Amino acid sequence: MRFSKQPSQKGEQKDARIVQLIELIELHYREQKNCQFYSDALALTSKRLNELVKADRGKTVTQLIHDRIILEANRELVFSTKTVKTIAFELGFDDPAYFSRFYRKQKGETPAKFRHRCSDSTI
């Protein structure tokens, strides 16, 4: 019975690092899209951070960052009248065309098509 606390402490430590990572992504996803930034902030190697995240979330750090960018892009596309170009710049993309390619790769459709599809479904 005395050993029962050891695994939970490790689990709590891992969870704390994951929580810290999510908080960091939330704060910096617009300007920091590189795993190295987050691993440095958490004093872990990129490889170790990815191992922890993969075990906990089933995704890599980069996938979590991309998911957060797409979530914000979707919100802006649906709930604002901002242009795709403006949204791209606000999300830290220097080139709106690159943002559109990134979005299409992640979602399987362009930002404009997503916006159009969502506006059609709300009528």
Tell where the protein language model's regions lie, with residue ranges.
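Basic, amphipathic alpha-helical hairpins
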Residues: M1-P7, I22-N34, V53, R57, ...
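Short, Lys/Arg-enriched anionic-surface-contact patches
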Residues: S8-I18, L24, K59-R68
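Charge-rich, low-complexity intrinsically disordered segments
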Residues: Q32-C35, S39-D40, L44-D67, L71
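Residues within helix-turn-helix
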Residues: Q36, K47, T83-T86, P96-A97, ...
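Core residues of bacterial helix-turn-helix
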Residues: L42, L91-G92, Y103
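Short hydrophobic/aromatic patch on the recognition helix
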Residues: L49-N50, Y98-F99, Y103
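Terminal helix-turn-helix DNA-binding modules in bacterial transcription factors
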Residues: A55-D94, H116-I123
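…primarily DNA-binding HTH/wHTH and HhH modules…
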Residues: R101-I123
